[in-house]
C-alpha cells in the first residue's frame, strides 16, 4: 500500500483503491505525432511532338508525334501512346517541369526545353512536349534511299523496292515521311562515295539510308578480299551525310540467292558475311544507325532464303519488305532498346 503523508489509515486505504494520492507523480504522457498534410496530386495530359523549327510550340505543319517516349513530371512518369499522347494521373501539386527519358527516344532525337508548369493545370490543358532532330538545314521527314539497283527496286512488281513500304510505315508511325530515290543501277560503293555529295545537295534529306556494296564483288580486286573498298567507301558516305546534318542509316549487305550456284553464290555469301562484320564494327565506330538487313533476311528466309529473291541478287516483294522492316526498326526503335 502507498502511504500518503498525513492521511489517516482509512483514508489511505481509500486512496489505494482509487489508485492515486494527491501529490504522487503522474505517468509521462506521449507527445502526439503531428498529422502530415496530405500530398495533393492531379492529372496532367500531354503530347510528344517533333518540333521541326525548335520554337517550342506545335505549328500547323508539324504533324509528327512520337510514340513510346517516357515523360516524367516530378516523381511520376507515363509513356506516350501511338498518337504521342500521355497522361500522368497523379502529378504532385506545385510548380514542376517535365523531362523525357533519353533512352526512350529514337536515335539522334533530343529533348527540347520545356517551361515550368503549374500542377494542377487549368482545365483542358495539354502539355506540348517538344523533341528535336539536329539536321541543320536539311528537310524534315525526308529520307534519301542511296544505293545501287537494289535501292532502285529492280525485281519488285511496282518498281519501288523497299522505298514504298518504308514510306508507308514511317507515315503510319510518325504521321509524316517521304522517301526519295537516289539509287543508281550497277554502281559500286566507291562510285557511291563519289556521287553522294551531289545527291545530298540536291535532295537535302533529314536521313540518308544507305545500302551499298553488293556490286563490289564484281570487281576482281574485291572478290577475294573481304570488304575491299566497301567499308571505307561506306564510311565516307557516313561522313558526307553527317557533314551537312543528315542522319546516316546504314544497312548491312543482304545475302545473294543461294540457289544460283553457277554464279558462285556460296563464295559470294561468305564474302558478304565477312564484309558485314566489318560494316557493323565501322558503323558502331562512326556512331551511325545500323539496320541489320542481313540478319533480317536470314531470320525470315531461314533455310529457304531463295524464296526472298527474284534472281541472283535482287529481292522479290517479300525480300524488299524485309529491307523496309529493318530500316524502319533501326530508325524508330528507342536508342536504349536491346536491338541496338
Task: Tell me the role of every PLM-derived stretch.
Residues 255-340:
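Catalytic His-Asp segment of secreted/periplasmic serine-dependent ester chemistry enzymes
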Residues 95-128:
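A short, solvent-exposed loop/turn motif at the edges and junctions
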Residues 36-41, 47-66:
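Structural motif
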Residues 87-97:
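Short Pro-Gly-centered beta-turn/loop motif in secreted/extracellular proteins
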Residues 132-185, 197-204:
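Serine-esterase "nucleophile elbow" of acetyl-processing enzymes
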Residues 58, 65, 72-87:
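Short, acidic Ser/Thr/Gly-rich low-complexity loop/linker segments typical of extracellular
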Residues 211-217, 237-273, 294:
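Active-site segments of SGNH/GDSL-like serine hydrolases
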Residues 44-50, 84, 131:
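A short, amphipathic beta-strand motif
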Amino acid at each position: 500500500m502507498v502511504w500518503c503523508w498525513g492521511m489517516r489509515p482509512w483514508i489511505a486505504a481509500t486512496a489505494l483503491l482509487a489508485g492515486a494520492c494527491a501529490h504522487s507523480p503522474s505517468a509521462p504522457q506521449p507527445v502526439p505525432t503531428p498529422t502530415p498534410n496530405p500530398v495533393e496530386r492531379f492529372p496532367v495530359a500531354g503530347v510528344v511532338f517533333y518540333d521541326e523549327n525548335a520554337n517550342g510550340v506545335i505549328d500547323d505543319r508539324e504533324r509528327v508525334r512520337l510514340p513510346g517516349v517516357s515523360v516524367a513530371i516530378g516523381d511520376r512518369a507515363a509513356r506516350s501512346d501511338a498518337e504521342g499522347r500521355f497522361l500522368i494521373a497523379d502529378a504532385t501539386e506545385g510548380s514542376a517541369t517535365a523531362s523525357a527519358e533519353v533512352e526512350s527516344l529514337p536515335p539522334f532525337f533530343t529533348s527540347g526545353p520545356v517551361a515550368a508548369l503549374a500542377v494542377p493545370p487549368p482545365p483542358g490543358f495539354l502539355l506540348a512536349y517538344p523533341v528535336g532532330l539536329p539536321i541543320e538545314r536539311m528537310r524534315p521527314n525526308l529520307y534519301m534511299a542511296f544505293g545501287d539497283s537494289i535501292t532502285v527496286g529492280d525485281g519488285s512488281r511496282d518498281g519501288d523496292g523497299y522505298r514504298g513500304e518504308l514510306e508507308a510505315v514511317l507515315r503510319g508511325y510518325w504521321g509524316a515521311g517521304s522517301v526519295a530515290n537516289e539509287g543508281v543501277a550497277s554502281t559500286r560503293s566507291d562510285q557511291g562515295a563519289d556521287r553522294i555529295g551531289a545527291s545530298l545537295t540536291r535532295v537535302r534529306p533529314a536521313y540518308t539510308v544507305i545500302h551499298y556494296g553488293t556490286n563490289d564483288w564484281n570487281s576482281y580486286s574485291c572478290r577475294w578480299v573481304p570488304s575491299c573498298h566497301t567499308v571505307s567507301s561506306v564510311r565516307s558516305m557516313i561522313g558526307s551525310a553527317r557533314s551537312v546534318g543528315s542522319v546516316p542509316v546504314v544497312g548491312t549487305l543482304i545475302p545473294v540467292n543461294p540457289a544460283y550456284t553457277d554464279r558462285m553464290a556460296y563464295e559470294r555469301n561468305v564474302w558478304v558475311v565477312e564484309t558485314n562484320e566489318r560494316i557493323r564494327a565501322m558503323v558502331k565506330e562512326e556512331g551511325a544507325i545500323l539496320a541489320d538487313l542481313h540478319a533480317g533476311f536470314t531470320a525470315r528466309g531461314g533455310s529457304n532464303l531463295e524464296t526472298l529473291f527474284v534472281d541472283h541478287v535482287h529481292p522479290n516483294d517479300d525480300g524488299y519488305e524485309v529491307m523496309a522492316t529493318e530500316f524502319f526498326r533501326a530508325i524508330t526503335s528507342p536508342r536504349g532498346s536491346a536491338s541496338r
